[in-house]
Amino acid sequence: MDWVLRRFLLGSVTAKVLHDISCPVLTGVHLEQPPHHLPLSFANITCAVDLDCHSQETLTWAAQFASDLHAQLNLVHAIPALEPGFEIPFGGDWKSDVANLARSDLEKLVAATGSDVSGIYVQAGESRKTVCSFAKSSGADLLIIGRGSQDGIPGNLPTNAYAIIRESPCPVISVSA
């Protein structure tokens, strides 16, 4: 049965590894030219969460990893760039309300995990663009994202996560939760 599923997996060896195993996976940045030097440490780490049921495990792992490396940890979350439809009445500053609600949920997540984070950032936009843009602008040395299991398949990586790994300006560790 596994061979049937595998044959429908498109992409690289990386995609197959991310799909098949449940341990954290470090993926590098796709570069046309090799770098002149490789970073010897990860001092500025960003953890991106989507506030799903796996966010707590992802943040806990990221916080422990950052602590072990004596690194700064930032938490980022992308909210959809919602635009009101014709039939949906939005009042007041609803965009701020959505961002504040997400920030509140992130603060609760940080408190629940006891994580030490340097900053919590909520930005509107498409997940892959927002997360990768934040990683670049904040000078992140490493990005940590969650890799949940869907339909009982360990290691399954949502579409946004594949795009984040592919487009990240820095190495990415995807954590199976």
What does each model-found stretch correspond to?
Residues 1-2, 111-143, 148-153, 170:
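Structural beta-alpha unit
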Residues 13, 105, 127-132, 160:
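Short acidic active-site motifs
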Residues 40-92, 96, 115, 119, ...:
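Small/aliphatic-rich secondary-structure junction motif
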Residues 96-107:
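Short, surface-exposed alpha-helical segments at coil->helix boundaries
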Residues 14-34:
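Short, structured interface segments
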Residues 1-16, 142-167:
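Glycine-rich, Arg-bearing micro-motifs that act as flexible, cationic patches
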Residues 24-30, 146, 173-176:
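Short beta-strand elements of ligand-binding domains
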